[in-house]
Amino acid sequence: MPEIRVTPLGAGQDVGRSCILVSIAGKNVMLDCGMHMGFSDDRRFPDFSYNTRSGRLTDFLDCVIISHFHLDHCGALPYFSEMVGYDGPIYMTQPTQAICPILLEDYRKIAVDKKGEANFFTSQMIKDCMKKVVAVHLHQTVQVDDELEIKAYYAGHVLGAAMFQIKVGSESVVYTGDYNMTPDRHLGAAWIDKCRPSLLITESTYATTIRDSKRCRERDFLKKVHETVERGGKVLIPVFALGRAQELCILLETFWERMDLKAPIYFSTGLTEKANHYYKLFIPWTNQKIRKTFVQRNMFEFKHIKAFDRAFADSPGPMVVFATPGMLHAGQSLQIFRKWAGNEKNMVIMPGYCVQGTVGHKILSGQRKLEMEGRQVLEVKMQVEYMSFSAHADAKGIMQLVGQAEPENVLLVHGEAKKMEFLKQKIEQEFRVNCYMPANGETVTLPTSPSIPVGISLGLLKREMAQGLLPDAKKPRLLHGTLIMKDSNFRLVSSEQALKELGLAEHQLRFTCRVHLHDTRKEQEMAMRVYSHLKSVLKDHCVQHLPDGSVTVESILVQAAAHSEDPGTKVLLVSWTYQDEELGSYLTSLLKKGLPQAS
């Protein structure tokens, strides 16, 4: 019997180094390839030896999918492809493809150039790894091979984050990566259709948390920042380069403007420029408000937030600094923290989750004496605050997604064991489905439904044979038709036969696009010009000028009409059926360029 097997190589009852191996109907897919920020030894990367037991890695794995650019999801990718030896396709969205190498290089500089770590990937390895990447658009079905297909859904969380559906035949797995079910100031909420997968693999970072009102949290954050700078203190906000950083920058920028505050706000050098560039480049990935107002005002060009210089950390007086990385495990945020930790007037606000082993996790757990590098002890006197601006779904959001997707089974990853256990019970009780939470290296095996026999009508087979394509046992062919179930038996018939048998009338769905052209001529004359232009350009298509003045190209209909407000403008209505969608799009773009001048 066919089955689905899932083995977490990372993020099994743990947060960090997300890496999940999925086998579905004989296809092997690796979901994410992250590093653990709390370790600097072999435990940093997932245990890839599991993949190499079956021989050559590229022969074993059909593809790798990266959900988003955070290093706990993509940080081990160059190591895996260039040092372990994976040479197959790597799928991710375009924003992830653009931002991922920048964050990998930033981390490499910290690990190798500053800390002197060995057995780490090089700059060239990052470049070589990214050459293997295939970019995926949202809702685009990508055919990895003849049987395996993948599809991306919007996940919120960070710019470019996606949930992925992996499908082989009738079996499918949905992997959420990290996602957020509530929209924020710069991104929309995650969304997936009622795809009813065989298995939903979901993150469970906040498995037992139901967040309070976002407005209350924002008010509390602004109050604490304001009080600290008013008493002359400094505020450190450790963030990752893109994501919560932009969310909190927009919040503080608006507050500073409203309150007319003078204390300087700084952001790690270079990162604001990079962030601004990528948000401009990938504006369709942001939320509706930002997309609407972007032409008039770029929300990411901040008036009160300036680039940070290392020397500013020693300057007297109040200030607010956004510094990377977000867990205080290295880099500029850790350097500033060490300088400011001894002054009780100062404050550090941790806006997101910190994995075990990081300085961020230690101070949030109440440690006030920290052993740093070289056995130095750092006494923390500054105030420590945790305010969850994390872009992960809370327990309510996870339950909402499960209800939305309607899976047959659920598997939890990217969370802590005790919290996962609580959520597991909730899911099983509410949705009456099996829920699993394997540890790293543990395999969950799910039997899947056997194949269903389908009878094919003789008429449909004859039509296929008439196309001159001979059957090939080694290469399956797709048959397009309408599936009818009667007395628990399935038959595949032509759409014409289905309509006849079921006594239904055919309905046709048409898409219409308006094209505005400046032209003072009458509609009939305009239609004639359109006909002449299309006839000369589309020589391989049947272009007709009908008696009513409209023009047809295959199933596409073009009609000229007067503009209701501007007599000097004509409106071309271009409509087509989904079968001619490609030609319809081409025709629309062609007409938008205008008509050639009459000789």
Swiss-Prot record:
Zn(2+) 2 binds at residues 72-73, 178, 414. Its cofactor is Zn(2+). The active site is at 203. A motif (Nuclear localization signal) lies at residues 469-479. GO terms for molecular function: RNA endonuclease activity. It comes from the Eukaryota. Pfam families: Beta-Casp (PF10996), IntS11_C (PF21386), Lactamase_B_6 (PF16661), RMMBL (PF07521). Keywords: Cytoplasm, Hydrolase, Isopeptide bond, Metal-binding, Nucleus, Ubl conjugation, Zinc. There is a cross-link at residues 381, 462, 475 (Glycyl lysine isopeptide (Lys-Gly) (interchain with G-Cter in SUMO)). The RNA endonuclease activity is inhibited by BRAT1 that forms hyrogen bond and hydrophobic interactions with the active site. The keyword Hydrolase applies. It is found in: Nucleus; Cytoplasm. Sumoylated; sumoylation regulates its subcellular location and is required for integrator complex integrity. A motif (HXHXDH motif) lies at residues 68-73. InterPro entries: Beta_Casp (IPR022712), INTS11-like_MBL-fold (IPR041897), IntS11_C (IPR048662), MBL (IPR050698), Metallo-B-lactamas (IPR001279), RibonucZ/Hydroxyglut_hydro (IPR036866), RMMBL (IPR011108). One of its GO terms (cellular component) is cytoplasm. Its EC number is 3.1.27.-. RNA endonuclease component of the integrator complex, a multiprotein complex that terminates RNA polymerase II (Pol II) transcription in the promoter-proximal region of genes. This is Integrator complex subunit 11. It comes from Bos taurus. The lineage of its organism: Eukaryota, Metazoa, Chordata, Craniata, Vertebrata.
